[in-house]
Amino acid sequence: MPSAPIYVLLGTIGSGKTLQAQNLEHVVGGQSFSIGSLIRQRLSDDPRMARGELLPDEEVNSIVVETIKHVPENEPIIFDGFPRVASQKEWLDAQGEQLGRHIKQVFYLRVDEDEVNRRLSLRGRADDTPGAIEQRKRVFHDETLPVIEAYRAAGVLVEIDGNKTPEEVEQLLVEAVET
């Protein structure tokens, strides 16, 4: 039996990952999971959230396992914002093999800094404090960009211009999945 696909959406804070992951559900089926949203729901009072810190891999991986264990084995999974660091990528690769899944495509929603700042000024999420925003941007540049480059080297990365309207970005995703 062929393995079920995993799709990944990565991008900096405010790049539209969650919306596009939900849109991707309509194209490939399956279920999307915003790991950041799940973490915020479970740890809303945790001071690490207000500081924009990454949680230890063990905590994040535990949330991922708990979340996906109910997904039927033949159904695609769409991760939004995960894996964020190299160790999480390695864990997901190994976990995928154990679960009979494979990374089919990784979409990098590339958004310019000015556009990110504009979007964040409109978003108004409780954990979007100036300090937390800067910390998450640093983590993206220092930790997530190398993950993106690893997926590029593996031949599964699709770079999407995330500066466009949500509808245009969705269309680019649809076209990329269908090719």
Predicted regions and their residues:
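Glycine-rich phosphate-binding loop of ATP-dependent small-molecule kinases
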Residues: M1-T179
